[in-house]
């Protein structure tokens, strides 16, 4: 109900929760009733079963369970009330529990009791007396007392016994009272029917303190079908003056899978446009009205579907209530019989519904479990911090828990933060007039201003991310994708009107802000929350179109010092740049330098809109594009959603809009003004390395400044930032900004420290997720060793997660590999082999759960041989990252400053001529080279292993030293590049020199005679032809063929994997020996493919992978390991326990397989009785039918499961268990197919024939 309406408490005796179906029904019931506190009695759960009780939205669960499956009670607190316990007391036998604590509004204590059937009044009296010191005015006692408290509590109207009277006396002495009798002194309503005595009674009670009676608002008995008791629910008034919890509508995407709903909405869209789209209607208002109409239609459709679904249940429940009412006043055996019948009907309906829900949920896990998907991610990620804010510090630095005051404090804080608007337009213009900003050309501006097209809208809708929270209007991305054909023309007209008028629909300005606590920060301080904003999807579509346009020209506007949100730029560029600068400073004899990491105060939120708009004008943006951005920032508003309450909206007069795809680029453009000011200010001395002066590195608002002549440069830097801040709104936290200081002595360092307002750190600072160290020799320790420690801690946290070894491999790929790649990418320094061996050991221990591996790691590293599952080799990824620097050398891009400044001894131009070019004599790498020398060593080693010449290749550039050293004219090289391409491959070496293409033949006549002779002599030389007149290898293509670094690591890693193949025992060869057969190359391919394609579910495919890879231990293998002479079959047949024997030859197993083949014959499938078919998926060549293969594969894998389950048991696997497993697979695939368009036909085709046989077997 939520505390806005008061606190609701619900109590129910559930009569056992060991059945999963019962637990699901209870959870479903709680979610429908939505009590704030739910008290459960007689759960029959034991101490070890406490994790079985879970209800989404009620995660604070306190239980008292005994050692046996008797008694057992629990109290569940809704997440919405933010309950924090202060005192808990439990009964070791599970008969009572006391929990005291605070909700976000009030203190409360609950005593939940389940009295035993024998001497119940005495037990209650003793329990309450024993806890009398804990009972206060805030206490509420609930539970199944197993005794009435008043004469009216029994249908027999029998007098109360002495024990009950004594109990009532104790209750009165403790100032407690029966709340139900206080509200209904003369009413006869019961919670339990005793079939043995044929009587009704109210033995479930809620007691409250007399001093607090005014808080109790309502109490009622709630009929319950799944238990033999009815529930009892009480509502308490909330005396605090609170805002009502906001009910925000959000489209249920499941409705979009219903074709009837889709058709109805399409009709509604057409009808709305026919009635309202006319010249008198403003199109912006038309669109907002359309959304309101469609929202109403969705609500009506959902209500209709819900009513239709529950109609039968509601009719039966109404009839049941009427019969029970009549039965209370005038009992009749016939009526009792009808009541029992209706309850049974209701139970059957509800059970079917819950089973369907369970199967849908199971089928989702069936498809996704152990894969790189949501279930695994949920298992490994940290528990999400609850965003409930129950206390905050006020202006006097005192903590307040008053909800109204919390709401006021936070709303005022964010209103002030976003409403700080500068009006100094003249100062802004003067400041920007003095800035030398780059400008877009007229043609580029025209491209920005071209009319929005329907194809742009359709493409943007298609690429919207799915399963994301919608904005205030509640319409999701899936809504726009489902009705794309209908909505694109409407949005096109809307956007065209916006382009003409410069006015957005009102809903485009709206946003909801949710506050998320910053990790590791004091949650009682208002500034320690991160505001997350949600805009409406239609506004995002428009903004994304604008983003796509400006992104094409952003590199012309933004300097390569900025790498955040810039296409083709990566964060590690600036990390490498910073490390190279640090290394350079450390080499200097005279030091007066500083590396400063500037912390901006809410940088995105403080940017002033007038400054941003004028900056856009300064870089040449004008016309329609500028008009649209001005419209977006003309009057945006936001509402904070705080603990479910929507606070009063306020205008956003500063800051880029959160959740808007355009915001990062606009912010970068605004930040570029400051970056240019710093670069152009000569008094701010940067670090000089060779011909480069390095001053800045930026990733959005993360800024590092490199300074020489520290005191004077810092003074001027602060002046420049202050001037910028005065017009832009940008502010820095000087105390949070950290710096490395480099001086010649301690006295000089102290002088610098005293003169700057920043925090000086002695050893390290964190930047973009890695540690920069003051001395580069500490990089390995602070990053590589830290990474190893983090991985070890992570796998230790995950050691008990419920997933198989395949799931653990995927966890490594999903959670460990990205982290490792990021660290290696940022800092690819030399690391010892022992480091990777340690990582491998940690990972293998995790995968096999501290047990001995049952499959060789070399086998698991081969994707094709491991059923599509690959165990990542971190050392190979590391090598790939180290080598990839060579690609950047070959491309010689101007933006790669990070690469050129590493080594002062080497001419930066040299790097361009290292790859596939004439050898350079005496390369001066320098003994301290961190990255490039290590890359070069590894690059050469791989080329040698591939038997490739690292200096000459078909992809050697025409402007290489090989050609330039021929002293050709510049015009000749230009002609060659225009006619034959950029590489030697286009020239055609040897006898076909310049004769392969018409363009080449034509070019010959243009080349100077002596140049042609020199060129021909070079291109026909035997040593050149032998090395370069061939098809380029994949390795050569990686570095010289691809123009983008996207996927570069993957491509290099793929080649390195191919080179580093390690020999291991081939499981297929093992099967060949056992089966005394030879498998051809095609057979092996079929077996490997069968492992990968046998099922869409990894839990099913895992069985086939295990079988093919010879995973299971056998008596022969165990005897070899333990050096025991006993190799006999564990099933007791006396045979030698080889793998083939355990799977096929054992008489008990053979009998089972014959039963399987009998079913095959029933399906009219004729297959030879051969183990290679069920165990390896190698079907006879004449078995062409894919249907037969699909259904047989499912049957055989189910059989493998049953055999593996009884692996060491001396019995024949059960055919009943096999059919049950098949039925489970059928059910899971059925629900999975229902969710996917087009899959159900395939499902029916596969299972149609087998379904009839399964039904007959299961029913037996």
From Swiss-Prot:
Residues 497-772 form the Reverse transcriptase domain. Signal peptide: none annotated. This sequence was constructed from an alignment of six sequences, determined by these authors but not shown, belonging to the LINE-1 family. Mg(2+) binds at residues 599, 701-702. Residues 1242-1260 form the DUF1725 domain. This is LINE-1 reverse transcriptase homolog. Pfam families: Exo_endo_phos, RVT_1. Its EC number is 2.7.7.49. InterPro entries: DNA/RNA_pol_sf (IPR043502), Endo/exonu/phosph_ase_sf (IPR036691), Endo/exonuclease/phosphatase (IPR005135), RT_dom (IPR000477). PANTHER family: REVERSE TRANSCRIPTASES (PTHR19446). Keywords: Magnesium, Metal-binding, Nucleotidyltransferase, RNA-directed DNA polymerase, Transferase. It is an enzyme of class 2 (transferase). It catalyses: DNA(n) + a 2'-deoxyribonucleoside 5'-triphosphate = DNA(n+1) + diphosphate. One of its GO terms (molecular function) is RNA-directed DNA polymerase activity. It comes from Nycticebus coucang (Slow loris).
